[in-house]
């Protein structure tokens, strides 16, 4: 990615542009002293309607403040041909020619420097706090505990009420600004920020960055993102830093074209896994990836592959780690058997449709059924010492805490590119016991018996997030449903969050399904 997010930035970068930008950040965005805060409160009103709210932006070319929501700043940009403005709440730069928030390396550096200065002024200003009360802390750094003063203890006695998180609390719900076809990223961010154990990890400040440049660490950025989500702010967040880091570390996702949400999920988990060095607690890893980072602790499972020789019935077993399970659907070019009773595949308007109901369990049964590899895929059997036909069967050796199921709705081949719109019924609660390697081995040995409650509970999951794709393969949009509390669901459509019913969730098409274990064993 080039240092400049768009070519229109160059028209602003003339003599003294850095100093001019610093003044705007110091006076109107990052207000570090009481004086600058008073100036901001007095000066920052829309020059057209006089409002303080409605996402005020400041023109970068002249002294003009305008509402973004009511498009007063847009009118100014059009009339004066001043194409760049700055968000006075978050500091993001908006280009009216690109019609999007942009990233520029030089301008971002100025913003970070001024934000850091303002933060220091807020923390160490004698007018605000006593110097011994606070220490500057960063993500993953040590911090001193809060020791209340005598005055603060008196105030606490007079104000015994505390803020409680109730079932109606909306902390953690926050929209995300679409930065130009970035709905694929926004829906995954919503799923990750509502993953309970991941939330607990980041909000407890447990990441210790060991990268030479913390500014390039995706885990540090995720820590900041979680703090933003659970800060109580309700205005949409602008994830431009996250987008830039993803583009930097996963270059195949760079650019403003629409990307695949599943591909982004895997790329994000991979980068987070690589950047989690230093977070290992020193204990032996209890997952097939042999890594104790938070990503592998939560998302890594073990997939067992048994290849059985058709002559001597010898079995060769391998176990591979996985972060997700991709499932074929009826209507794809891959044969799908068995379908639920009454199913009938067909093609309508170039897209695949199936009558009847296909369930997630159907897809999992197909995924774990024995598959004959055929004469063209003979393997050398270690028992027969010769090439023989064989069967292959996949089962779950170890289940992850969070199981992500990818319904393969996009089919790409030399002759065909299409979206499969088959409706797949998925449950709110899922029992993975029938698909475990241990269940298969017990059945083969004729020793299958009902598992104990503790073992059975270990394989039970609850749905907590669903990612959907609306539209066609060429033109579509991603949204997500997330569970905030038990049986309380919300639809996340970029910056817009709306309440949803359970029926809305289970009636949706489904592209990525996120399930969380109902019972956890703590080591």
Swiss-Prot record:
Residues at which Zn(2+) 2 binds: 46, 49, 67, 72
The protein's name: Ubiquitin carboxyl-terminal hydrolase 22-B
EC number(s) from the headed UniProt entry: 3.4.19.12
Gene3D superfamilies per the UniProt record, alphabetical: Cysteine proteinases, Zinc/RING finger domain, C3HC4 (zinc finger)
Family note: Belongs to the peptidase C19 family. UBP8 subfamily.
Record GO terms (molecular function): cysteine-type deubiquitinase activity; zinc ion binding
PANTHER family: UBIQUITIN CARBOXYL-TERMINAL HYDROLASE (PTHR21646), UBIQUITIN CARBOXYL-TERMINAL HYDROLASE 22 (PTHR21646:SF33)
EC class of the enzyme, as a word: hydrolase
GO annotation terms (biological process): chromatin organization; protein deubiquitination; proteolysis
Species this chain originates from: Xenopus laevis (African clawed frog)
UniProt-annotated binding residues for Zn(2+) 1: 6, 8, 95, 98
Domain of life: Eukaryota
Keyword Protease: yes
Active site: 183 (nucleophile), 477 (proton acceptor)
Cell compartment(s), UniProt: Nucleus
ZnF segments: UBP-type: 4-121
Cross-referenced SUPFAM superfamilies: Cysteine proteinases, RING/U-box
Cited function: Histone deubiquitinating component of the transcription regulatory histone acetylation (HAT) complex SAGA. Catalyzes the deubiquitination of both histones H2A and H2B, thereby acting as a coactivator. Recruited to specific gene promoters by activators, where it is required for transcription.
GO cellular component, one term: nucleus
Catalytic activity: Thiol-dependent hydrolysis of ester, thioester, amide, peptide and isopeptide bonds formed by the C-terminal Gly of ubiquitin (a 76-residue protein attached to proteins as an intracellular targeting signal)
Keywords (A to Z) from UniProt: Activator, Cell cycle, Chromatin regulator, Hydrolase, Metal-binding, Nucleus, Protease, Thiol protease, Transcription, Transcription regulation, Ubl conjugation pathway, Zinc, Zinc-finger
Location of the USP domain: 174-518
Lineage: Eukaryota, Metazoa, Chordata, Craniata, Vertebrata
Ligand binding (Zn(2+) 3): 59, 62, 76, 82
Subunit structure as annotated in this protein's UniProt entry: Component of some SAGA transcription coactivator-HAT complexes.
């Amino acid at each position: 990615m080039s240092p400049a997010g768009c070519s229109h930035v160059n028209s602003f970068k003339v003599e003294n542009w850095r100093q001019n930008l610093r003044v705007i950040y110091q006076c109107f965005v990052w207000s570090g002293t009481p004086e600058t805060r008073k100036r901001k409160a007095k000066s920052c009103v829309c020059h057209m309607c006089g409002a303080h709210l409605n996402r005020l932006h400041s023109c970068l070319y002249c002294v003009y403040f305008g509402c973004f929501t009511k498009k007063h700043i847009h009118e100014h940009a059009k009339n004066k041909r001043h194409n760049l403005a700055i968000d006075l709440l978050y500091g993001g730069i908006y280009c009216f020619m690109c019609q999007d928030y942009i990233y520029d390396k030089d301008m971002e550096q100025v913003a970070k420097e001024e934000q850091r200065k303002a933060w220091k002024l807020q923390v160490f200003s004698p007018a605000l706090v006593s110097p011994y009360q606070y220490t500057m802390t960063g993500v993953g750094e040590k911090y001193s505990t809060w020791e209340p003063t005598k005055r603060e203890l008196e105030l606490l006695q007079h104000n015994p009420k505390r803020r409680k998180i109730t079932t109606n609390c909306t902390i953690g719900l926050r929209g995300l600004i679409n930065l130009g076809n970035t709905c694929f990223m926004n829906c995954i961010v919503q799923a990750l920020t509502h993953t309970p154990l991941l939330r607990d990890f980041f909000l407890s400040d447990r990441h210790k960055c060991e990268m030479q440049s913390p500014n390039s660490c995706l885990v540090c950025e995720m820590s900041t993102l979680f703090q933003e989500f659970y800060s109580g702010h309700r205005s949409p967040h602008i994830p431009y830093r996250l987008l830039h880091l993803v583009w930097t570390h996963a270059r195949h996702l760079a650019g403003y074209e629409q990307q695949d949400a599943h591909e982004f999920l895997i790329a994000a988990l991979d980068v987070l896994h690589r950047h989690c060095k230093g977070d290992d607690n020193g204990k032996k890893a209890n997952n097939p990836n042999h890594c104790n980072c938070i990503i592998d602790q939560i998302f890594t499972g073990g997939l067992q592959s048994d290849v059985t020789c058709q002559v001597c019935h010898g079995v060769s077993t391998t176990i591979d780690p996985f972060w997700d399970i991709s499932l074929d659907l009826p209507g794809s070019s891959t044969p799908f058997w068995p379908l639920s009773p009454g199913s009938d595949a067909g093609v309508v308007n170039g897209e695949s449709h199936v009558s009847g109901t296909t369930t997630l369990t159907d897809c999992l049964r197909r995924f774990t059924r024995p598959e004959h590899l055929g004469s063209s895929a003979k393997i050398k059997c270690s028992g027969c010492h010769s090439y023989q036909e064989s069967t292959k069967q996949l089962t779950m050796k170890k289940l992850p805490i969070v199981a992500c199921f990818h319904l393969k709705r996009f089919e790409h081949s030399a002759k065909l590119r299409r979206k499969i719109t088959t409706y797949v019924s998925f449950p709110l609660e899922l029992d993975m016991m029938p698909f475990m390697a241990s269940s298969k081995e017990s059945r083969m040995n004729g020793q299958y018996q009902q598992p104990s409650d503790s073992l059975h509970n270990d394989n039970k999951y609850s749905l907590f997030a669903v990612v959907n794709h609306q539209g066609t393969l060429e033109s579509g949009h991603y949204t997500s449903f997330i569970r905030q509390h038990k049986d309380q669901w919300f639809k996340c459509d970029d910056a817009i969050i709306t309440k949803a019913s359970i029926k809305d969730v289970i009636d949706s098409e489904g592209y990525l399904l996120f399930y969380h274990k109902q019972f956890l064993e703590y080591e």
